[in-house]
Amino acid sequence: MDDDHKVSNDISLLPDLNFDSSSPFTSIEFDSSICDLLNLETGGDTPNLIPDHNPFFDSFDGLQEEEEDSHFVVEPESPKVYIAPRVMINHQDSFSLDSRNDEYIEDVKILPGSPGGIQDLGLSRLKVPGSPRAFVHPRSSGSPRFVSPTSPVLIDTAAPFESVKEAVSKFGGITDWKAHKIQTIERRKTVDQELEKIQEDMPDYKKQAVVAEEAKHQVVMELERTRNVVEELKLELEKAEKEEQQAKQDSDLAKLRVEEMEQGIAGEVSVAAKSQLEVAKARHLSAVSELGTIREEIEMVSNEYESLLTEKDLAAKKAEDSVLKAKDVEKQMEGLTMEVIATKQLLELAHATHLEAQEKKLDAAMARDQDVYNQEKELKMVEDEIKRFRQDIDAADDVKTKLKTASALQQDLRAEIAAYKDSNMGKRNNSDIQAAVDSARKELEEVISNIEKANSEVKTLKIIVGSLQSELAREKHDLSETRQRNREDTREEKCTEIAKKLQEASREAEEAKSLAIAAREELRKAKEESDEAKTGLSAVERQLMESKKEMEASRASEKLALAAIKALQETEYANKIEDISSSPKSIIISVEEYYELSKQAHEVEEAANRKLAEIVSKIEVAKEEESRILENLEEVSRETAIRKVELKEAMTKVEKARDGKVGMDHELRKWRSDNGNRSPEGGNKENLSKSKSALHQPTTFTFGEQASSSNVTPQASSSNVTPETETKKKKKRFSLLPKVFMFLSRKKSSNK
């Protein structure tokens, strides 16, 4: 299997040998396409794949007659072959200019059957010339060479390749893979460099885009301005065209009138006078229509002015309401600040009390640890003494038993003495008997004194045991008190939690204070905006007054124009009357005077139009300012509403903090009231010191006082106890045991 994946010049032709070893091996025939494929491009001879002398074939020369039974015979009419995978060589460095050196396509057609039995026959491998640097593609699972013998047979009916170039061109052509790989790497590098350049240029392009947007915006604004200017110029052009037409009409009429006057035509016959009258009538009608439109516009402006006045009054009322609300909010904020200050002071007091409680807790813990250590030490000593006392009691019991035995022996001795007296009355002397009796009496007295001493020692030991039992009871009581102190420590931990809650409440109060400060700033801003709105309203009022004055001036100019029109009408009426009467008293106006009058009327009309336009523009500006002021007032009202909501939230937070503070104060008072009668530093220590001091007196040691001191009830007073008295009482507690030792040593010395 390893040879199949290596670069090799050899391809083994493995015929199907899946038959019995006794079957004859007759011949191997190849299709003509194999020979054609193995030819060189120049048409060289077919290479001899089978050597001339092969011992393998020599051994089977006698079996060539049985060609019908052979499995290796391939008929030329219908050759059934397996197509081995083609190996295409494409290394440019192995090519040369000589066309004969082109690579072979190693296409071997294998006879039907599985390549399995070649090892049994020992067939030598057939070699096909190939390139020394051939690259064999890995075989796929679908290759016909790996198909089982039972699979359907594939028949190659395609025409053979005439040359290697044809085969290569059929399968994609010749390419330089090394150069192609280098080109792809270079392309990738160039693409990466271009990407890096693009990424580096991205911010510059973004800046350019922003600048272009700004320039576009400016150009759009300039376009709008130019449009407005163009519209204004169009209006001015229309006015100029109208004036030019009127001037042309006037000049034509003046020329006609001059010609008629030169010709001597006058009165009704003059065409110029008629046309002049018609023009004057048309102008009069246009002026009347313009006056009507101007009146309508003035009425609209006056209505808008009245609406602006009403809106101004409403805005002023809203501003006053906002100012009042701001003042109320300021008052509320002052109250909140006072409450926040008070809560801060209370929190500081609570923090101080918490610190004091922690200090007391630490002192109590230290004292408790010291007491526990001392009590354990004393308990060990007392246990040792109890063991000794028990040994002494056992010794006393032994003495009692010995005394009983001695009394029994005494009775026996007395009986023996009496018997001896009765028996040996006459034998012994009275002096010897008396001496024996005296010695026996002395022994009895010594035994009796020893018994009395033992009894007294037993009594003293019983008393000491009772005192020690009372001491143990007191120690148990002290242990219970220490447990109670531990419980109080848990309470103190609860107090620390309460202090933490107080700190959280103080933090919330500070947050509420900051919110209140922010609300104050917002109110100040609202006041400033309301002041600005007031100044804007005053400016609008001034502009409205100016517009009123301008309207009055326009009305005056309108009156002047009406008076001029009336004068023109009167002159026209007079001319008509003169024409009708044709009297020589008719007034003839010169052309210059007529031009002057018409010019004055035109100027008056233009002035009225200009004033009306100015009034309209000022009214529009006033409307815009009023709308801006109203928008500002609406924003102020919205902000005040938001600040009100924030103030309500701050008030709720402050109320919650106040409730928490009150609850914490209540819990602190309860804890103080619970721990005031039995503080860990005062009452318990005083009880212990009194119980310890009652065990001894500085001069004598009496068990009656010891017994009476065990029944004394301590009085707790945390204020009267000082550390000096506590240390003295601790020192007095150790004076009991040495006196007991002294008493016992005296007894032992007296016994000796």
UniProtKB/Swiss-Prot annotation:
It comes from the Eukaryota. The keyword Lyase does not apply. Residues 690-723 have a biased composition (Polar residues). Residues 476-495, 653-733 are annotated as: Disordered. The modification Phosphoserine is found at S143. The keyword Isomerase does not apply. Keywords: Coiled coil, Phosphoprotein. Residues 653-675 have a biased composition (Basic and acidic residues). Residues 186-557, 596-651 form a coiled coil. Belongs to the WEB family. This is Protein WEAK CHLOROPLAST MOVEMENT UNDER BLUE LIGHT-like 2.
